[in-house]
């Protein structure tokens, strides 16, 4: 579904204010929660290339670079994060180490090269076409795909419906999604990736690592 998402709708929620809040939280606490869990699931990243889709201020990219990744690429649909992302890299001595791009990853997938590791942290729940998003992410992962997505639970689906009613009443075109987990994994499997680990984080999130046969 190329071009299915209006960046204006994303900028309303993922704004400069939210970027500043994320940077402030990182400065105070460092990497926490599901972000930290995903970095742990990455394992040994020495010398690898990383593609982070929807990574916001780039905290996971920074963590993987500090862990030994050779280079990183970011694709973020909201341009409101760019200034704070550059600040974060500069503060830790990594200015110029991340190739940052603004755009819809699915629509722009043909212009983006494959990477060893691809990251989708809390991105699946923000995109309507899960098959296209996860499929392109898997196709771009030479070695490993890391994801965090909502668990398959009834109360999460109910909560998502409530959130979307509120967004509609607020005249915001953005919607959130609770895609079936098996559909997420199937989209990756269609491109040759199989689950290595799946870990639940509290009552909401699940993180997973999926690898390509013979790549590790």
Question: Predicted regions span which residues?
Answer:
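Conserved class I S-adenosyl-L-methionine
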Residues: 1-43
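A short SAM/SAH-binding and catalytic strip from SAM-dependent methyltransferases
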Residues: 117-129
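A short glycine-rich, Lys/Arg-flanked "PGG" loop and its adjoining helix->strand segment in the class I
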Residues: 132-143
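Conserved beta-strand signature within the Rossmann-like core of class I S-adenosyl-L-methionine
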Residues: 142-151
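Short alpha-helix
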Residues: 174-192
């Amino acid at each position: 579904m190329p071009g299915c998402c209006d960046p204006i709708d994303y900028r309303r929620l993922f704004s400069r204010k939210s970027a500043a809040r994320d940077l402030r939280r990182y400065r105070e606490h460092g990497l926490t929660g599901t972000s930290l869990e995903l970095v742990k699931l990455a394992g040994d990243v020495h010398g690898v290339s990383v593609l982070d889709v929807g990574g916001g201020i780039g905290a996971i990219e920074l963590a993987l670079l500090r862990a030994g990744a050779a280079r990183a690429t970011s694709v973020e649909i909201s341009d409101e994060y760019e200034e704070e992302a550059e600040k974060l890299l500069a503060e830790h001595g990594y200015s110029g180490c991340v190739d940052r791009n603004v755009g819809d990853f699915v629509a722009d997938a043909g212009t983006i090269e494959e990477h060893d590791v691809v990251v989708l942290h809390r991105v699946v729940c923000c995109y309507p076409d899960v098959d296209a998003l996860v499929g392109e992410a898997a196709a771009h992962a030479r070695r490993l795909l890391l994801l965090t997505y909502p668990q398959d639970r009834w109360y999460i689906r109910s909560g998502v419906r409530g959130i979307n009613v509120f967004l509609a009443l607020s005249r915001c075109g953005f919607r959130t999604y609770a895609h079936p987990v098996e559909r997420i994994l199937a989209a990756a499997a269609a491109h040759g990736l199989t689950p290595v680990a799946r870990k639940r984080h509290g009552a909401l999130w699940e993180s997973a690592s999926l690898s390509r046969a013979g790549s590790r």
